[in-house]
């Protein structure tokens, strides 16, 4: 067993670390991480810092596939184990490996009925760990809504984030009735909630078998924003704006839009209903669609068509805005119909 040398010392966001009160080790299961990539290292460090018993981590054989943990500091004080040692010492085994490797790695572990098999993928279904369930183990998905490209930063910014959790109980356990109903009554979900809160995360319980939809939705709120920024920059390039000025102007605009959405959600939370949970976001929309400014919308569409650009994308985004504005009651029926009619002129034929 090896231990990386210098412990990681949080500097980028020490206030978040101070907000977490370490929980006595006996209150949590013993956990081990199979895989020492960015997610595994970040979570192992966060759990260890919070007082959760992290018994060790497993990394691939360094002769065939070196794992770059030297100098990272996130795994300092956490023993490196063999796969056999991890299975013997841990109650929860976290498979923090690439999605395509989850099933293969799960098949190589000597599972027992006291184990909980965990993966951190957003889209991969829990059935990828079927071999663990066949051995009597419970399955759990634990997907922090967090960016792990910079692990040291990720450790410090975990507090305040949400985590998507899905559970498939062991064969001997009662069947899961529904994500929210079981959230307060199932011991396994209570344990998962306690672990999440130990590192400052708030759970979102996912309906079984719907991870792909959950992950696609998260993608809209994350990387899809980057695609929209790129599309905006492409239009600006045609408008003659210097490339070095584009992101300097667009990124603050995007940040202010997110801030407006947060404010609208907080101010109009009482308007949200089960049938229209995102209605408050309609109050954050600005621009010609929000004003029902038909002339401007038509000029936008004409310009895009003239330059052979993506009119369908503009229409699709505008139609989503119309739906939100309608749910929020921000436009009259007459205004909504006028915007829809303007968009329909450019519908594919």
Kindly give the residue locations of the regions a language model identified:
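NAD(P)+-binding Rossmann beta1-loop-alpha1 motif at the extreme N-terminus of oxidoreductases
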Residues: 2-85
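Phosphate-coordination loops involved in phosphoryl transfer and adenosine-cofactor binding
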Residues: 28-30, 114, 160
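Short, well-ordered alpha-helices that flank and scaffold nucleotide-derived cofactor binding pockets
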Residues: 41, 45, 49, 107, ...
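Internal alpha-helical scaffold of NAD(P)-dependent oxidoreductase catalytic cores
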Residues: 43, 66-75, 153-268, 272-277
């Amino acid at each position: 067993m090896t231990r990386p040398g210098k412990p990681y010392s949080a500097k980028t966001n020490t206030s978040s670390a101070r907000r977490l009160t370490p929980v006595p080790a006996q209150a949590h299961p013993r956990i081990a991480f199979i895989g020492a990539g960015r997610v595994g290292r970040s979570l192992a460090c966060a759990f260890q810092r919070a007082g959760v018993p992290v018994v060790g981590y497993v990394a691939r054989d360094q002769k065939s596939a070196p794992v770059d943990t030297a100098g990272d500091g996130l795994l300092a004080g956490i023993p490196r184990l063999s796969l056999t040692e991890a299975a013997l010492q841990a109650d929860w085994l976290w498979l923090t490996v690439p999605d395509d490797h989850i099933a293969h790695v799960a098949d190589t572990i000597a599972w027992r009925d006291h184990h909980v098999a965990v993966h951190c993928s957003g889209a991969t279904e829990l059935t990828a760990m079927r071999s663990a369930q066949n051995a009597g183990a419970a399955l759990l998905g634990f997907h922090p809504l967090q960016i792990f490209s910079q692990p040291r930063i990720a450790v410090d910014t975990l507090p305040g984030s949400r985590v998507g959790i899905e559970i498939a109980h062991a064969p001997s356990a009662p069947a899961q009735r529904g994500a929210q109903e079981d959230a307060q009554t199932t011991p396994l979900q209570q344990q998962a909630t306690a672990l999440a809160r130990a590192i400052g995360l708030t759970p979102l319980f996912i309906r079984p078998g719907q991870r792909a939809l959950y992950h696609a939705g998260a993608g809209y709120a994350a990387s899809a924003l980057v695609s929209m920024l790129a599309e905006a920059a492409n239009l600006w390039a045609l408008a003659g704006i210097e490339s070095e000025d584009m992101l300097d102007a667009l990124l603050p605009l995007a940040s202010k839009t997110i801030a407006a959405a947060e404010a609208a959600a907080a101010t109009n939370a009482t308007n949200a209903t089960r049938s229209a949970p995102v209605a408050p976001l309609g109050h954050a929309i600005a621009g010609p669609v929000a004003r029902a400014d038909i002339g401007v919308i038509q000029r936008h569409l004409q310009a895009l068509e003239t330059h052979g650009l993506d009119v369908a994308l503009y229409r699709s985004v505008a139609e989503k805005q119309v739906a939100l504005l309608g749910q929020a009651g921000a436009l009259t029926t007459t205004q909504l119909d006028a915007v829809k009619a303007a968009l329909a002129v450019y519908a594919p034929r």
